[in-house]
Amino acid sequence: MARTNVKLCPPKRSKRPSNSRSKSTSHSNRRSLNSLRRTRTSRRSNNGKFT
């Protein structure tokens, strides 16, 4: 039982950094989505002004 417990501990530690990495990737994805939305809105406003 002790051996299984010891084996279970390292995976939990490895999972924590993976979660932080996923969070960082999600943040970067949100930033890219926000930038895309801004460019789309700016393009729409520009098109409206030109028309």
Swiss-Prot record:
Chain segments carrying region Disordered: 1-51
Biased composition (Low complexity): 19-36
Protein name: Uncharacterized protein W
